[in-house]
């Protein structure tokens, strides 16, 4: 996939949502296995479908207010500990350039949301608690925070998953090409396994050939 494909998907979603709407889409979260060891990270399929980004703890916000459209990626501010354990993370300018995202902010920089005229809120209903916590933690003044919560409670809630599922049912030419390529790799791997199988082999020996 090239990054223009992800941009094209975001534009398609923008055309599908109603006017005076705001979209919230969370990335996956890292999950602790034990102590300071996490399970291998698995990105949210829908977040990856719209961004191509494979990092945790991020939020994509798309607004369609009257004639004003905007796309904002929100992420954690990198620190020295992150650099030690995960290496150099992309900068805000890197995200903008590489993934063609209009605005990139750190969570602690997000001090306003264009919700004044947002009559509809699209988000994955499974992430409702995360969305409520995000709004609760926004760095807003007390009047702003009170207004935002009141306006949020009045907005029509729409499950974003249904829209994205409809989009994902129809594959682009590049997606079809990738699926065919993956199927060919899998088919060749199974053929090689069948050729190498013989009496007395243990399962782990067959698996080693597959890997």
Annotate each language-model stretch with its function.
Residues 171-211:
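Active-site pocket-lining segments that scaffold enzyme catalytic pockets across diverse folds
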């Amino acid at each position: 996939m090239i990054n223009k494909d992800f941009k094209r998907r975001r534009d398609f979603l923008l055309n599908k949502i109603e006017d005076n709407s705001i979209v919230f889409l969370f990335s996956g979260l890292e999950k602790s296995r034990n102590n300071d060891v996490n399970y291998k990270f698995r990105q949210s399929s829908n977040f990856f479908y719209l961004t191509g980004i494979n990092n945790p703890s991020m939020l994509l916000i798309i607004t369609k207010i009257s004639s004003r459209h905007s796309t904002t990626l929100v992420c954690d501010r990198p620190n020295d500990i992150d650099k030690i354990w995960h290496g150099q993370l992309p900068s805000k300018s890197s995200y903008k350039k590489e993934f063609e995202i209009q605005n990139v902010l750190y969570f602690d920089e997000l001090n306003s949301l264009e919700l004044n005229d947002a009559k509809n809120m699209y988000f994955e209903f499974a992430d409702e608690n995360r969305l409520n916590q995000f709004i609760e933690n926004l760095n807003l003044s007390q009047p702003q925070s009170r207004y935002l919560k009141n306006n949020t409670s009045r907005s029509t809630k729409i499950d974003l998953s249904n829209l994205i599922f409809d989009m994902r049912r129809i594959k682009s030419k590049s997606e079809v090409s990738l699926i065919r390529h993956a199927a060919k790799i899998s088919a060749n791997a199974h053929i090689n396994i069948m050729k190498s199988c013989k009496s007395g082999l243990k399962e782990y020996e067959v698996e080693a050939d597959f890997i």
